[in-house]
UniProtKB/Swiss-Prot annotation:
This is Eukaryotic translation initiation factor 3 subunit B. The lineage of its organism: Eukaryota, Fungi, Dikarya, Ascomycota, Saccharomycotina. Belongs to the eIF-3 subunit B family. InterPro entries: EIF3B, eIF3B_RRM, Nucleotide-bd_a/b_plait_sf, RBD_domain_sf, RRM_dom. Its main location: cytoplasm. Residues 1-220 are annotated as: Sufficient for interaction with PIC8. RNA-binding component of the eukaryotic translation initiation factor 3 (eIF-3) complex, which is involved in protein synthesis of a specialized repertoire of mRNAs and, together with other initiation factors, stimulates binding of mRNA and methionyl-tRNAi to the 40S ribosome. The eIF-3 complex specifically targets and initiates translation of a subset of mRNAs involved in cell proliferation. GO terms for molecular function: RNA binding; translation initiation factor activity; translation initiation factor binding. One of its GO terms (cellular component) is eukaryotic translation initiation factor 3 complex. The keyword Methyltransferase does not apply.
Length: 220
């Protein structure tokens, strides 16, 4: 059996060998860093620096309801927090959940949070359609909806009452021993649940899955 040939790799000059084809074939690209799991929270309390750890603990507990909080950056200026912070969550899904659940949430009586994903903020900030010049907002001309308590001016001194039968709701004038008179023509599908008068009778509320609508004035 032949003896093995001794081979010292350090003695081989590879400077003249072109590996570009192999490098291109087996190149592993660096993963593109994504900010989809980052959110910006505005509207937080402006607190002294000494109370920043307590505030951070409260907000960490709040955002932990949406996913694991990896990191939280709370900038300081002149010895106090600036009212906003950047939160890194463990996934883009957790960031989406944070925006959905916590945007607009009241932290206390004076503070309401505004939560947005970091890429969205960059998208709006880099949008050429957004002007940096302040423009006075156009205020629409006031339109009167009539006297909201016009029913108090009824010459016969009658009260109003509401009837809800199946899908139809009607509002009527009432006076004892007199056939009820329609205030407005009964409407079908005016509400998806019930309807209620406000405590002082100024408004009539209809309820829908998407919210509540108020009705009032001489012509509801």
């Amino acid at each position: 059996m032949p003896e093995p040939i001794a081979f010292d790799e350090s003695q081989v000059d590879i400077s003249s060998i072109d590996f570009s084809d192999l490098e291109a074939k087996y190149h592993v690209p660096e993963p593109e860093h994504s900010y989809e799991h980052f959110v910006i929270c505005d509207g937080a309390p402006i607190a002294p620096e000494a109370k920043a750890p307590v505030l951070k603990k409260v907000l960490t507990k709040l955002f932990s309801q949406c996913g694991k909080v990896v990191d939280m950056f709370m900038p300081l200026e002149n010895g106090q927090t600036k009212g906003f912070l950047i939160i890194e969550l463990d996934s883009a899904a957790a960031a989406d959940k944070a925006v959905k659940q916590l945007n607009g949430k009241k932290l206390d009586v004076k503070h309401r949070l505004a939560v947005n994903k970091l890429p969205d903020m960059e998208k709006y900030a880099l949008n050429d359609n957004i002007s940096e010049e302040f423009r006075e907002p156009a205020i629409p001309e006031f339109r009167s909806h009539g006297y909201l308590k016009s029913w108090l001016l009824d010459p016969n001194g009658r009260e109003q009452f509401m009837l809800h039968h199946h899908d139809t709701v009607g509002v009527y004038w009432y006076k004892k021993n007199i056939q009820p008179e329609e205030v407005i023509e009964p409407r079908a599908h005016w509400t998806s649940a019930s309807m209620k008068f406000s405590p002082k009778g100024t408004y009539l509320f209809s309820f829908f899955p998407g919210g509540v609508q108020a009705w009032g004035g001489e012509r509801i």
